Each structure stands twice: as C-alpha cells, then as structure tokens.
Amino acid sequence: MGGDGWPSDGHILLLIVLTVLTPPSLALYRLWIHPLRSYPGPRWWAIWRGPYILSNIRGNLVRDLQRLHQQFGPVVRIAPNELSFIVPEAASPIYTSNPEFPKDPMHLPPFHNGTPGILAADHAHHRRYRRLLAFSFSDKGLRHERSLIERSIDLLITQLHENCGQGPLDLALWFNWATFDIIGDLAFGDSFGCLENVQTHPWIASIQGNVKLIPILNAFRRYRLDGLLRLLGSRKLLEQRRRNAQFTTDQVDRRLKNSSTPRGDIWDAVLAQKPDGEPPMTRDEMISNASAIVLAGSETSATLLSGCTWLLLKNPSHLHQLTSRIRSQFTHASEIDSQSVSRVEGLQAVLEESLRLYPPVPMQSNRIVPQAGAYIAGGWVPGGTSVGLQQFVACRSSSNFHRPDEFLPERWQGQGEFAHDRREVSQPFSIGPRNCIGRQLAYVEMRLILVKLLWHFDLRLDTTRMKDTDWLAEQGIWILWDKKPLWVTLEPRNE
C-alpha cells in the first residue's frame, strides 16, 4: 500500500498483469498440459465451458454433440473437465462400477427444499429410497395398481371417441394428459382430472417450465452466482419453478393428512414400511421424491408415445403391419389389458426402435470419475473428470447402427443387415443400480395406450397443420424434449 492507504503503483501493475495473463495462461494449460489434453474436441470447448453452457441454454446441446462426435469420433472433450462417449463399452464403467461413480452435481436439477430426491441422492440415500419405493414399481406392485392405470387409459379412449369428430387432435397433448392422470392416481391416489376436464393441469406447465430453467440454474450454480438469477432470470420460468415446488408440497401434505388410510398409491407401501435400522422417509424427502416421480412418470412416457406415433405415421407400412397384428389378436376391446398386450407380435420391437430414435431423456446423467482414475472404453480418464454416454447421439451413430436414422423395427431381431448393430448401446432407462425405477410402469403404459389407440382408431397425419414439418427434428432439448403439437386425424375403425 502507498502512504495514503491506496494500492501502490507496483500492486496496480501486478493486478493488471495478472488480469491480462491469466486467461491466456489458463487456455494454454488446458490445451497443452491438462490431463485431458490428448482427447479430441473443439479447442474453444476445451478452453472454457462457455460454448457448452450457451448451447445447453438454447436447447441445442444434444445436436451440437452429435455434430462434434461426427467430426471428432467416439470420445470427445466437450468442456475443460468433461468427456462425452458414444461407445457401448463406456456404459459399464460409468454406470455400473462398484464403488459407483457419483453423479455430477452440476448436471443434476437443483432441489428447492435442500433435500435431494431419488434422482440426485448420494449412494446411501438412493439405496434407501429405492428400497422404500421398490414394491410400488415392481411387477407385483403394478398388478395391484393395474385397475388405476387401465381406468385412465379407458377414459383416454372414450374422450378420443367423443372429440375426434371435431377435427384433428394434438395427440402429444392427449398423451400428456393421460400419463399425468395416471401418475396422479399412482403418486397421490387421485387423478389430476386432465382427461375428465379436457384441459391441461397447471402443474404440467410448471413442470415443463421448471425443466427449461434447469440449464440456466446449473450455469449460475457452477459459478456461484445463484443470487443473480433472481435479477437476471426469466420471471415466467422462475414463477413456474416456484409453482412446481408448491404443487408438490401441497399434494404431499394432503397425502400425509390421510397417512393412516390406504389409497392404493405408491405411498401406501412407503408409509407402511418400518425400515430395520433406517429412518422412514421424511416429509421433505417425500416432497423431493414426489417431484421426481411425477416428472419421470408422466412426461417421459408421453414423450415416447408421441415419438412412436410420429414414427409410425411417417412409416405407414410399419403402422399398417402393427395395426393389423393388433386387430387380428383381439376380437373385442375387453380382451386388451396390461397382460395381453405384451404378446402382440412386433410391438416390443416398435417400442425399442422408437426409444432408440427418440429416447425420452436424450442425455444420460453425468458421473464423476473417482480420484484414483479409471479406464473407460480403453482409455485412461483421470479422477475428477465428468463423463457421460450420450444416448441420442450414440443411437444415431453409424458406428453403432446400420442405417441409423431410419425407423426399422426389424433391426431388433438382430439378423441380416442388422446383425452387427450394437443394440446394447440403446439404454433409454439407463443401467446399473441407478437405472429407472419406473421402467416397468413405462412399458405397461406405452404398450396399453398404443395397442388400444390402434385397435380403436385409424390414424392419419393432418397434412394441413403438419405440412413440411419434421416434427422430431424441430424440437429443442432442455434435458427433455420440447414437444410440439402432433396433429393427427382419428377415425373410429369400422368394426
């Protein structure tokens, strides 16, 4: 300091020098000295995270990563300390190692009440949550809940019959209504009434707004600028996030007031269990888990059904074949239930191919390599690196699939020209101990809704509203797909 308390000229000069030299020095380090220097990728992305963050906020990240993998190969450095993989050999070490690679907190949705749910919990809490919720999502549990699921799907078909005469319907919206009502019944013992009232519940809009806000929240969290978000963030998105938290809290509190009365929902088993040596689920834990369950249990199934319908409509020979098989197997609508639909020939292949081309969660969550480091897909990755297998990009890569952009359900037979397809890379529900607990529920919903829809109706894309539209390609991705309306003409079949 100078005699008057101000910094001396030397200190000022040092500050200027550091300010000027630090960015280029950091860039040189990350390009030429950093442990990830040997991995290919765009230089700007390797130097700083700005391009990644901007791409993510704009909803372009998945397609930008697809372009980068086409340019640089199966492993790409997409940030100073992050690698992206698309080879199936990467899945096992990243997602099934024991001890596990912990989730990257900067890739997780922040939790509003300070308590992580099943999607973000550490290993111990995740294992406990999963054990408490396991029965409700098991085959046995779903058999108990079958009547709730089938009731909502029957109402969907009834409402489609009543409304299809008015003109084309937005099936993406109707699928959202159906799966949201189903998860309302399963999660809280009470439907949200979307199908009954033929309108969107406010919670759906708040969920979708909250998902779009997550990349922005994580960008601010990464640089510890959370407080600035209230000043700079979209008021609409922030309000939707607040409303999403409030909806969840209100539903859980309402359920806890009737905790002693069985309601046929997932909380019956949770509230009834007395864990040996472990505490039961707290109110805050129930709120965080309910939020995750409602999102994962409604939005993802509706997304796949929308994508599957689009792909079938764009590939009429496959639509005709599946429709014929469904109608030849079932003489009466009453024969269609959650058990019988699993026996429809070719149905599973159609769903798997739809999941490959249009995975509801295009990016799997990133993990952090333990400090000791690890070999992933034949290469050494130092500890502390964020790693992930990009589901959408991997499934659209010609290195994994023959004719990767075409809808070809027959590829799942693994024969002929598709014998060398690396089908194991398609893991839309993830793998390992943190795979999707609702996988069985999703398949039950998807099979039952699709079979009933095609049994009752002939489908035709509304060319007036969908003319020259590549419905799938035009969607942005903010963790989940930003689905556009899917206008379809439904004609009740001539039985």
Swiss-Prot record:
<dbReference type="InterPro" id="IPR017972">
    <property type="entry name" value="Cyt_P450_CS"/>
</dbReference>
<dbReference type="InterPro" id="IPR036396">
    <property type="entry name" value="Cyt_P450_sf"/>
</dbReference>
<keyword id="KW-0812">Transmembrane</keyword>
<keyword id="KW-0408">Iron</keyword>
<keyword id="KW-0325">Glycoprotein</keyword>
<dbReference type="GO" id="GO:0004497">
    <property type="term" value="F:monooxygenase activity"/>
</dbReference>
<comment type="pathway">
    <text>Mycotoxin biosynthesis; aflatoxin biosynthesis.</text>
</comment>
<dbReference type="Pfam" id="PF00067">
    <property type="entry name" value="p450"/>
</dbReference>
<keyword id="KW-0503">Monooxygenase</keyword>
<dbReference type="GO" id="GO:0016020">
    <property type="term" value="C:membrane"/>
</dbReference>
<dbReference type="InterPro" id="IPR001128">
    <property type="entry name" value="Cyt_P450"/>
</dbReference>
<feature type="binding site" description="axial binding residue">
    <location>
        <position position="436"/>
    </location>
    <ligand>
        <name>heme</name>
    </ligand>
</feature>
<comment type="function">
    <text>Averantin hydroxylase; part of the gene cluster that mediates the biosynthesis of aflatoxins, a group of polyketide-derived furanocoumarins, and part of the most toxic and carcinogenic compounds among the known mycotoxins. The four major aflatoxins produced by A.parasiticus are aflatoxin B1 (AFB1), aflatoxin B2 (AFB2), aflatoxin G1 (AFG1) and aflatoxin G2 (AFG2). Within the aflatoxin pathway, the cytochrome P450 monooxygenase aflG catalyzes the hydroxylation of AVN to 5'hydroxyaverantin (HAVN).</text>
</comment>
<keyword id="KW-0560">Oxidoreductase</keyword>
<feature type="glycosylation site" description="N-linked (GlcNAc...) asparagine">
    <location>
        <position position="289"/>
    </location>
</feature>
<keyword id="KW-0479">Metal-binding</keyword>
<keyword id="KW-1133">Transmembrane helix</keyword>
<dbReference type="GO" id="GO:0045122">
    <property type="term" value="P:aflatoxin biosynthetic process"/>
</dbReference>
<feature type="glycosylation site" description="N-linked (GlcNAc...) asparagine">
    <location>
        <position position="258"/>
    </location>
</feature>
<dbReference type="InterPro" id="IPR050121">
    <property type="entry name" value="Cytochrome_P450_monoxygenase"/>
</dbReference>
<dbReference type="InterPro" id="IPR002401">
    <property type="entry name" value="Cyt_P450_E_grp-I"/>
</dbReference>
<comment type="similarity">
    <text>Belongs to the cytochrome P450 family.</text>
</comment>
<dbReference type="GO" id="GO:0005506">
    <property type="term" value="F:iron ion binding"/>
</dbReference>
<dbReference type="GO" id="GO:0020037">
    <property type="term" value="F:heme binding"/>
</dbReference>
<protein>
    <recommendedName>
        <fullName>Averantin hydroxylase</fullName>
        <ecNumber>1.14.14.116</ecNumber>
    </recommendedName>
</protein>
<keyword id="KW-0472">Membrane</keyword>
<keyword id="KW-0349">Heme</keyword>
<feature type="transmembrane region" description="Helical">
    <location>
        <begin position="12"/>
        <end position="32"/>
    </location>
</feature>
<dbReference type="GO" id="GO:0140395">
    <property type="term" value="F:averantin hydroxylase activity"/>
</dbReference>
